[in-house]
């Protein structure tokens, strides 16, 4: 086995272990934020939505800067610093008794993610061969699902005693992850050339097709982020107990572990990436619309199952499509920019979703936020369809001219 192949194989195992630690640390804390501050402390959902949206926007919106810096200086220093910063954010969250302190803790957490997320994504693109990326992203998603349910179970158990224990556990896991990277991650370069920060960012922003695709995905993310805000609140309201939230993540884990990899393997042989992304988004959108009209936990979990199946179809295709569009000369910058849609869609989804949830509750129209999210998903589906049809038309024109 050549040294390059050996490095790729070792890199795969490193990425999987690193990803599990990050997922556990994140899901111990974040699914319980809305339960803690909305249900237990009586805050308005929009206040918590602002905090979650701020974290999302900072982490993903500034990702292009984090990626460009990583292109220049390498992955290791950015990843270690970012993980320690997230640990500090979680520690601060444990003592948050005013909205501004929760917002500050989410700001710290988001800045940490800005530093470590783009270089971690770029390492996947660097180490995994193009023909294997779809399956590897599926493995990461399966791991995300298993880690989410384990983290949510652990966090729910700790929440019975003290929310500070929840946050301390998340902080410790990120400190361990920082130590793991500091000890074992080689000083790998992310790009084929050591690209200056400004040049990497400029290269991405001039790629109009990539930027348009990324911004359109904001609508997809408005739906996707509700697993952290409105869906846990809805499950808690219908079930009457915060402990029911863990079953939502258990459903996701079961579906992902049984369906994600087989669906990815089968669909990559029969369907284009664009079609898989659009089909998943359509299922997610249609499953969102009736959520506000259900009154039983069984009906709610059925709709959540459909939502997760849509995500299982769409997410590996989205990741693979984003990676395939990245320029090898500025991988970190491209993977950072690919999170821009998540920054915008996540922020709007959290803040707007929280506001619509409060508005629907006060107006006795609980279906309002869910119908709006479904409509946004349908419009995003149509916009992506138009973009992909334009791209195919341009390709056919070039082939005819040749």
Curated annotation (Swiss-Prot):
UniProt keywords, alphabetically: Antibiotic resistance, Cell inner membrane, Cell membrane, Membrane, Transmembrane, Transmembrane helix, Transport
Main location: membrane
UniProt cross-references to CDD domains, sorted A to Z: MFS_MdtH_MDR_like
Membrane topology (Periplasmic): 34-98, 160-164, 235-243, 298-299, 361-367
UniProt GO BP: response to antibiotic
Molecular-function GO term, any one: transmembrane transporter activity
Segments on the Cytoplasmic side according to the record's topology features: 1-12, 117-138, 186-213, 265-276, 321-339, 389-402
TM segment ranges: 13-33, 99-116, 139-159, 165-185, 214-234, 244-264, 277-297, 300-320, 340-360, 368-388
Domain of life: Bacteria
Covalent S-S links between cysteines: none
A Pfam family it matches: MFS_1
Listed SUPFAM superfamilies: MFS general substrate transporter
Membrane topology designation: Multi-pass membrane protein
InterPro entries: MFS, MFS_dom, MFS_trans_sf, MFS_Transporters, Multidrug-R_MdtH
An annotated GO cellular component: plasma membrane
Location of this chain's protein in the cell: Cell inner membrane
Stored PANTHER family: MULTIDRUG RESISTANCE PROTEIN MDTH (PTHR23517:SF2), RESISTANCE PROTEIN MDTM, PUTATIVE-RELATED-RELATED (PTHR23517)
Function: Confers resistance to norfloxacin and enoxacin.
Family according to the record: Belongs to the major facilitator superfamily. DHA1 family. MdtH (TC 2.A.1.2.21) subfamily.
Protein name per Swiss-Prot or TrEMBL: Multidrug resistance protein MdtH
